[in-house]
């Protein structure tokens, strides 16, 4: 039985919800870490995990499927050239969702969503001068 296997509506119409998740997916692929509310983060995981699995098998059909879902040529290129090879040996679990306190205005639970096995960013000049 498939009781309670639906998706979170997030108080949006279906077109608004799909556009928001597409934008969040593109942002996460571009920056590799984003901050959002916890329900959005949990719903984003259901979208982006299959996308990265798609990126592990570079074929024209998979590129077209990815472009159909992402609508961003640069992110499709990054998905297949950078992220697919990075997660070639990992069988799922590409995201880490960390609880990040509560938003000041409406006390919504926030979350930090990041890709696993991110390459370490070198410290910028301002960070090294401050420390």
Curated annotation (Swiss-Prot):
SUPFAM superfamilies: Prokaryotic ribosomal protein L17 (SSF64263). It comes from Nitrosospira multiformis (strain ATCC 25196 / NCIMB 11849 / C 71). It holds the Pfam family Ribosomal_L17. Belongs to the bacterial ribosomal protein bL17 family. GO terms for cellular component: cytosolic large ribosomal subunit. Keywords: Ribonucleoprotein, Ribosomal protein. GO terms for biological process: translation. The lineage of its organism: Bacteria, Pseudomonadati, Pseudomonadota, Betaproteobacteria, Nitrosomonadales. This is Large ribosomal subunit protein bL17. GO terms for molecular function: structural constituent of ribosome. InterPro entries: Ribosomal_bL17 (IPR000456), Ribosomal_bL17_CS (IPR047859), Ribosomal_bL17_sf (IPR036373). Part of the 50S ribosomal subunit. Contacts protein L32. The keyword Signal does not apply.
């Amino acid at each position: 039985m498939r009781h309670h296997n639906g998706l979170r509506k997030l108080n949006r119409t279906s077109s608004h919800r799909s556009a928001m998740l597409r934008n969040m997916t593109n942002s996460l692929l571009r920056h590799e870490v984003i901050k959002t509310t916890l329900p959005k983060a949990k719903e984003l995981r259901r979208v982006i995990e299959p996308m990265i699995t798609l990126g592990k098998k570079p074929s024209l059909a998979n590129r077209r499927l990815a472009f159909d879902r992402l609508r961003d040529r640069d992110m499709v290129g990054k998905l297949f050239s950078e992220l697919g090879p990075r997660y070639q040996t990992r069988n799922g679990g590409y995201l880490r969702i960390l609880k990040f306190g509560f938003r000041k205005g409406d006390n919504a639970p926030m979350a930090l969503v990041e890709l696993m096995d991110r390459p370490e960013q070198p410290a910028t000049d301002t960070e090294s001068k401050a420390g």
